[in-house]
Amino acid sequence: ITIYELHLRYYYQGLAYSGFPYVYHTVGSAFAVKALSYVKAGGMNRKQAGEDFYFIQKLVSSGGYFNMNSTTVYPSPRASSRVPFGTGASIGKLSAYQNSTLFTYNFLAFKELGIFFGLIDRFFECRPDELDGHFNLIPHGLRLFLNEKEWIEKLTEIKNNTAGIHSFKKRFFAWFNMFMIVKYLNNVHLVYFEKKSVEVSASELLEARGIIFESREPLDFLLYYRAMEKNG
């Protein structure tokens, strides 16, 4: 469970590093929501798995959410085969093999997202007929994921329905939301990047932030990542 929780917190910090504006734990979260906000977001779907993920990614884009750091909720180290992903499935796989490790998203994928999000102002400022040239500025892994024609059509639609950079960004991230990010991360690790052990990836993210972490023990990483999140 230590390794899996580190994976969740590494993913959270990877999103924060990329500059994604709606960073929130969408797997293993304990959350509460007001009834009116629940209704406005369309409610929770009836999928048998991932319903928290789908609901939260709709909810957080409206803003007004916050994290409670005055208490702690620990994921349960309980194996489960109810669904093929998530805490229960991961614990089951890790428990089945002695000395096994968990492979997580390559930190370079989050760096690609950071470059991509850093181009948003240029996407807004350019003319529609310049979008094809701007597509070539997008990092290679993301270009493999995005269909150029569909990307140009989507950006043109967003530009035609926004008057300023604030509304442009809001529409952009309503499209390239957490669901799209997960799809990209899963795709890019099939065709371009290789996953790495969660300890290596956690270390690389810290190094990118100028933090040299001596220990390679998962628990030490986890305690540090918990503190990072709590302290903002």
Regions found by a protein language model. Name each.
Residues 78-99:
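PAPS-dependent sulfotransferase catalytic core
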Residues 1:
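Conserved donor NDP-sugar-binding/catalytic core segment of glycosyltransferases
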Residues 36-37, 72:
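Short, well-ordered alpha-helical scaffold segment located
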Residues 47, 59-74, 80:
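Catalytic donor-sugar/metal-binding loop of nucleotide-sugar-dependent glycosyltransferases
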Residues 9-32:
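A recurrent flexible, glycine/aromatic-enriched loop bordering the glycosyltransferase active site
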Residues 47-54:
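Acidic donor-binding loop at a coil-to-helix junction in glycosyltransferase catalytic cores
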Residues 93-232:
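Terminal low-complexity segments of carbohydrate-biosynthetic enzymes
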